[in-house]
């Protein structure tokens, strides 16, 4: 009788966790590297996630990793990313997606435009959601660089917003800053996330401005505009405001440098954040 009761108790807990979502076994997690990087650069991070949060981790890369992350436009990388995920049957019931830097923009692109295998929690580490700009002039909005350099896809010159909206091939599309054939589905898919977590750092020496990691960016005078004051948020172009109002959009901050977010030195800070969602 005792053995029977034990069996029934275990069976009930199993059914409860699967039917009501009170998960006893974590869903899988996908990790995606950033620019000028590859899956091997995320090995320490992926192993730490797997052991710390009892989740099976798939540490993936696009193309050959390093070269593809630099020289392939993000529109092409996104197509390959979606195909790579759809090849993995273990992800078909849903997964958490952690994207590092540029990888966070691709992870968000997957959640918005693909998502046949649904993203549950979308987590981005120091990802330039607001774009990047640096102290030199170049032809970022030329068709050549848009087609041959990934960073051009999220280059945002605050003094040339018309060019950004017209010529930039990736970020204004996934931000719903311009109306496209995928605008409605992107907003629907973002609103379907259980949680959208952005992690940024004032000590991020690579992303300019660092606040881009939380959807903020410069105005024409190079003053940082808080996310709540952006058109993207105020007009809820993408569904971020909807998530925030329902306590499903979360901004967290570390004091790590950009690359440290994938290294053990930053793990204690990341643990305190990620334990809330994984």
What do the PLM-derived regions correspond to, one by one?
Residues 66-78:
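Catalytic nucleophile-loop/oxyanion-hole region of alpha/beta-hydrolase
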Residues 10-28:
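N-terminal signal peptide
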Residues 1-10:
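Classical eukaryotic N-terminal signal peptides for Sec-dependent ER targeting/secretion
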Residues 33, 75-166:
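Serine-dependent carboxylesterase/thioesterase catalytic core
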Residues 23-55, 59-63:
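Short, surface-exposed "cap/lid" segments of acyl-processing enzymes
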Residues 30-35, 98, 199-201:
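Short hydrophobic segments within beta-strands
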Residues 20-22, 86-91, 114, 181-190, ...:
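Surface-exposed acidic, glycine-flexible loop patches that form ligand/cofactor-binding
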């Amino acid at each position: 009788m005792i053995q029977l009761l034990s069996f029934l108790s275990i069976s009930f807990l199993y059914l409860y966790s699967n039917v009501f979502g009170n998960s006893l076994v974590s869903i899988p997690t996908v990790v995606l590297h950033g620019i000028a990087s590859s899956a091997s650069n995320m090995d320490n991070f992926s192993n730490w996630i797997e052991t710390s949060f009892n989740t099976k981790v798939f540490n993936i890369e696009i193309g050959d990793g390093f070269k593809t992350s630099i020289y392939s436009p993000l529109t092409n990388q996104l197509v390959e990313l979606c195909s790579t995920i759809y090849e993995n049957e273990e992800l078909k019931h849903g997964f958490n997606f952690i994207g590092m830097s540029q990888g966070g923009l691709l992870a968000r692109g997957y959640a918005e435009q693909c998502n046949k295998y649904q993203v549950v929690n979308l987590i981005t580490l120091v990802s330039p959601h607001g774009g990047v700009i640096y102290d030199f002039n170049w032809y970022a909005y030329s068709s050549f660089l848009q087609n041959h350099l990934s960073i051009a896809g999220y280059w945002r010159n605050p003094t040339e917003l018309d060019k950004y909206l017209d010529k930039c091939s990736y970020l204004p599309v996934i931000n719903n800053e311009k109306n496209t054939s995928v605008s409605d589905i992107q907003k629907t898919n973002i609103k379907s996330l259980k949680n959208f977590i952005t992690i940024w750092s004032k000590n991020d020496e690579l992303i300019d401005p660092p606040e881009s990691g939380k959807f903020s960016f410069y105005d024409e005078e190079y003053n940082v505009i808080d996310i709540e004051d952006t058109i993207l948020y105020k007009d809820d172009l993408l569904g971020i405001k909807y998530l925030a109002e329902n306590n499903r959009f979360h901004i967290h901050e570390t004091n790590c440098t950009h690359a440290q977010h994938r290294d053990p030195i930053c793990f204690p800070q990341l643990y305190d954040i990620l334990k809330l969602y994984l």
